[in-house]
Amino acid sequence: MRAVIPYKNENAKSRLSPILSKKDREEFVELMLKDVIKALDDAEVVNIDILTTSAEGIPNDFNGNVTITEPGLNDSINEYLQNANEPILIIMADLPLVTGDHIRKIISFSEDVVIVPGKGGGTNILFIRHPNEFTVKYHDCSFISHCEITDELDKSMHIFDSFLASTDIDEPHDIVELMLHGKGQAKEYAEKRFGSETGKGRVKISHLSKLSGFV
Amino acid sequence: MRAVIPYKNENAKSRLSPILSKKDREEFVELMLKDVIKALDDAEVVNIDILTTSAEGIPNDFNGNVTITEPGLNDSINEYLQNANEPILIIMADLPLVTGDHIRKIISFSEDVVIVPGKGGGTNILFIRHPNEFTVKYHDCSFISHCEITDELDKSMHIFDSFLASTDIDEPHDIVELMLHGKGQAKEYAEKRFGSETGKGRVKISHLSKLSGFV
């Protein structure tokens, strides 16, 4: 099997702009990507590809393949799937709460397709055993689209139920979840930016931080 | 073991008022309560208590105990826990995505305390093996409070990771999750109010509904 991470660094995550500048967001998305790569490493996924429109913001120590593609998430992933000859795990780069344990479970199901929904009808992770036959359709309630595509192919499907894996970081209030439940580098960054010590060895959202209005 | 459901019907869920009238919200919260009771029934939890400030909006076919308490969620639950002499599952009434399978798993962990976090630092479900010793503290990031209380008691803790059980229905966009992932009576109600058929045997959010602005 291989994992593929679609990734955009430049001016990414514009919905976080009320609390993070462009430069900060670019730093933050790279840390989230590092957390996702670490989860894959922890699950002993050795073949990792990044699909990106520019080589900016790829971690220096990343050992996998980086493919520069034209803009267009669906087209670039579908081309990738067409050329794949082994099971493919498509995992988004904004999932810093995902762990190696989640990945191990997701790739161990026997169903043809495993879907991890994102908030609001998104698709955070897709594991596809026979990728040549599959077409992705991200955006516009992709969770429903991917269920329908799987049905139409007469493939079996497992919907993976995890709060942590379903929490993609798009908006300020998602960073609250990251601070509460995270463990990696993106969480550390958020704590430094928005946290204050509670005195009990935990970090809470500082009432002085820009995030306090979003809790 | 026993399950206890804190419940408020009258003028409940005010954050849903942009899309549901007071009367509609009262109908909707009763359906969510029915779904929670069904999940407990499915898990063969036979002793179910409802703590409520008024007998309004209790399902007619509910066979358990209804206790009318003074307002004040923490005080009424803590009094309940003080008098308990068996493990207690505290489950909120606004969890229509929770299933019998979740409940069965939650009550089967060996840890002293099992916590199902809610969005934004809430606590959706708490399973407490030794309830006399425990004090709940809902509101103001109760997830952290309950972790700290468990730590201070030197008890073991399991944090249960489920997107469905962590999705409490507070705001319009939560109803999107209910329509996408629900199976019970509250989901049916939401579909009738806000859905339209896709022609593929699925229901999508109608662009004509009040919910369309929240997707």
UniProtKB/Swiss-Prot annotation, chains A, B:
One of its GO terms (molecular function) is phospholactate guanylyltransferase activity. The keyword Nucleotidyltransferase applies. It catalyses: (2S)-2-phospholactate + GTP + H(+) = (2S)-lactyl-2-diphospho-5'-guanosine + diphosphate. InterPro entries: CofC, Nucleotide-diphossugar_trans. Pfam families: CofC. Keywords: GTP-binding, Nucleotide-binding, Nucleotidyltransferase, Transferase. Pathway: Cofactor biosynthesis; coenzyme F420 biosynthesis. The keyword Amino-acid biosynthesis does not apply. Transmembrane segments: none annotated. Its EC number is 2.7.7.68. Gene3D superfamilies: 6.10.140.50, Spore Coat Polysaccharide Biosynthesis Protein SpsA, Chain A. GO terms for biological process: F420-0 metabolic process. Belongs to the CofC family. HAMAP family: CofC (MF_02114). Homodimer. Guanylyltransferase that catalyzes the activation of (2S)-2-phospholactate (2-PL) as (2S)-lactyl-2-diphospho-5'-guanosine, via the condensation of 2-PL with GTP. It is involved in the biosynthesis of coenzyme F420, a hydride carrier cofactor. This is 2-phospho-L-lactate guanylyltransferase. It comes from Methanococcoides burtonii (strain DSM 6242 / NBRC 107633 / OCM 468 / ACE-M).
